[in-house]
Amino acid sequence: MSSTVLSVEPDALPRSGEDAAAIAEDARLRDDIRLLGRILGDTVRDQEGEDVFDAVERIRQTSIRFHRDNDQPARDELVELFDGLSTPATLRIVRAFSYFSHLANLAEDQNNIRQMRLQNGARPGSLVATLAHARAVGISAKELRHFFETALVSPVLTAHPTEVRRKSTMDREMEIARLLDRRERLQMTPEEIEQHEELLRRAVLTLWQTNMLRRTKLTVLDEVANGLSFYDYAFLHEVPRLHGVLEDKLNDDDGAGEELASFLRMGSWIGGDRDGNPFVTAEVMRGTLRLQSRRALRHYLDELHALGSELSIAAHLADISDELRALAENSPDTSPHRAGEPYRLAVSAIYARLAATAHRLGIDDIRAPVAESAPYAEPAELKADLDVLHRSLVANNSAVIARGRLRSLRRAVDCFGFHLASLDMRQNSAVHERTMAELIDKAMPGKSYMAMNEEARIALLAAELRSPRPLASPFVKYSEETVDELAVFRAAAEAHATFGPAAIPQCIISMTKGVSDLLEVVVLLKEVGLVDPAGRSAINVVPLFETIEDLQAAAGIMDRLLGLHDYRRLVDSRGGVQEVMLGYSDSNKDGGFVTSGWELYKAEIELLKIFEHHGVRMRLFHGRGGSVGRGGGPSYDAILAQPAGAVNGQIRITEQGEIITSKYSNPEVGRNNLEVLAAATLEASLLQPRLGAPCVGYLKAMDEISALAFKAYRGLVYETEGFEDYFWSSTVITEIATLNIGSRPASRKKTHKIEDLRAIPWVFSWAQCRLMLPGWYGFGSAVEAWVKAHPEQGMAYLQELNREWPFFRTLLSNMDMVLSKSSIAIASRYAELVADEKLRAAIFGRIKREWHSSIAALLAIMGHQRLLQGNPRLERSIRHRFPYLDPLNHVQVELLKQHRDHAVDEQALRGIQITINGISAGLRNSG
């Protein structure tokens, strides 16, 4: 039997009619898949024996038949195959299919890199294409530079637990990815090819012998360390490089030779997000900031060390500036070998001061200084010294040297400072409310804050904001919760003093319900000196609107807030910018995919009107997940689908879980994704507004479709008797909680109510059983009902919406992708886990009808014959995955039966956890 376990089935080949380029592209991808599949197959045979290898192949072939034909004989054969396996053998098979998923992803990533190189930057979403578009409509390089002076593009990494792989596994996979890329780039002799394959075999074997699952639960600082690894992989080098590329392109256009303002800033929630995570404390936040600073300073010191080696310029061979000479004279380096090398001496002076800075910040385990020196007080001082080197080189005919490592380092210091990434503080409004209530009740006996209505609270909090006296007293005993909250705010004030105001520039309030939720935080910030009674604030107070009801109330809340004189002074002190965060996850769980997307869009339109009325600049922060059910999908399309004027040069957007890994674990892919964010922000700000707002008819139609979809979704999820039992029985929601993939609990409360479940495990569970219900449910019946109610417009009108309206087109495109990954045949096997046959038949039958209805409606509107017809590359990619993805689902179902039939079955549970890992990898954006 062939050892190519990970083979490509006929239905995964290019379809007839696809062009020669697509066929050639697919052939290269299949070659890589075959190579990795052959190596993994050999590894499985060598390590586990011929019987396990043969079982893997039989399961794969039978699973393909089931997927293709959905026939009962194939299902029965699968059950028989699993019944004949011992649990240890099943675990080996599960690991094999899971690693097939991981390796196929690497082959696909390499194929994407290959296509990026072939396109050479001229692709939709690239800076090349966007700048060409800008030139075509008459926007000059000077105007673009001016735009970037106030622009902000900020990817914000979060620790939301959707990445199920261990870092050790990811490290091994990155090694394999590098080997694949080397094979692609280099012309090899037959002997070198053989040696290269040996390296691949070694890496795959090491991967096979590495624990796939974490043995212990992650701590918050573990999550911080994992997040920081992506700075080494991509951000520290690629953020400066992106600025340099854009700077050069603008200067090529007009020859101005001007430097571009830094606009790309990294953000993070890891170590600052306390909403529902009791393990994020003041001390953890301090530790997070130290770890971040350590990563930034280590990078700068390493780059200075390399720069000192490179700048071997002799004083008698090249002139230098007076300021460079003065900097060199301050060097502690007394070696006679460098006496005539002023740039090296200047670099050593900078190095000594930076090492002293690290010591001042409590970071002593990186490169030591060559001598004592005065630390830098702030990053601007370090940047000023680096600028001295730059100016001297440019003034003395060495600009080409200045454009190398020195330019990258100068830009890095400008973008990352001493803090690396801006850490957001986030907490639930209910916690702030309880904290404020205790402070007020103990400071003002006789008052009961919790008994006050909203207007009374606003009046009291506004008065407290103006008062110079603090509310908290060191002589009063407070509850543990209040003590902890005050400690976190004090830690934020310390961070500003130590690392600068960019270290913690935002305080986000989850579940914002009213104006008082924001004023409570403002008063707490005043307690620690980050807000003063004179109307100055050192931090942005950011409401997060998450549920459908909250999104509908958002504009009214912001109108009232911005109309308060005391609060408006704080906004003005922050440059007249107010940030608003929109939550995609909870709004989806609350109202379904269609209504969530529509209410978010409408909220932006209404907020724009309010902010324009008050003369305040709005910055939106999009809390998107990886899956479409949590606001995921291509970033470029998502940004361009925003209402005209909503981006306006500034955007923050969350990146989380498996999406961080897929976007930023490879430098080239990372650079491309950062470029997409920058290009989309530019295009949405300067080019999209020219298209104008959608017509009133489009908005009315979407309002009606949303209401119908909302009714269908709520009717199933919240109003169907027994739905909670069905959900908990037919998905892996219980078993997901056993994975050590994050520090945060899976539920807000220990109940089985859907309302209390966090959005991530909700979406993750539906992805595992291949229904992806949060990404489409309600759409089909809504379209059917709308078309029936509007026969004069009918389907043709919805087809017009798809052609003419980016929002609607993006909504459908994301649904197209989700449905293509779903499988009603696979989902039917999970329905078997529901013991109550009547409940199973009723609910699964309803879901199945809506699934077929949604696909039919989607295809009719898009004018397609099959899912992903308009995206053949993604279609082929998903078809490639089914041969090794589907078997994992079948094994998972059998293991769930086994595990749930026995009180304790640790091996079965471990097998389930491995299938969760593999299915997540195969889907690529499951949470």
UniProtKB/Swiss-Prot annotation:
Pfam families listed in its UniProt record: PEPcase (PF00311)
Q: Which cofactor does it need?
A: Mg(2+)
Plastid keyword on record: no
Q: Does the keyword Metal-binding apply?
A: no
Q: Where is the active site?
A: 160, 589
User: Which PROSITE patterns did the record assign?
Assistant: PEPCASE_1 (PS00781), PEPCASE_2 (PS00393)
| A GO BP annotation | tricarboxylic acid cycle
Cross-referenced SUPFAM superfamilies, in alphabetical order? Phosphoenolpyruvate/pyruvate domain
Q: Which reaction does it catalyse?
A: oxaloacetate + phosphate = phosphoenolpyruvate + hydrogencarbonate
Task: Tell me one GO molecular function of this protein.
Answer: phosphoenolpyruvate carboxylase activity
Extract one GO cellular component term from the record.
cytosol
- EC no. given is 4.1.1.31
> What are the entry keywords?
Carbon dioxide fixation, Lyase, Magnesium
**Protein family (similarity comment):** Belongs to the PEPCase type 1 family.
Q: What role does it play?
A: Forms oxaloacetate, a four-carbon dicarboxylic acid source for the tricarboxylic acid cycle.
Name the NCBIfam families for this protein. Answer: PRK00009.1
Q: What is this protein called?
A: Phosphoenolpyruvate carboxylase
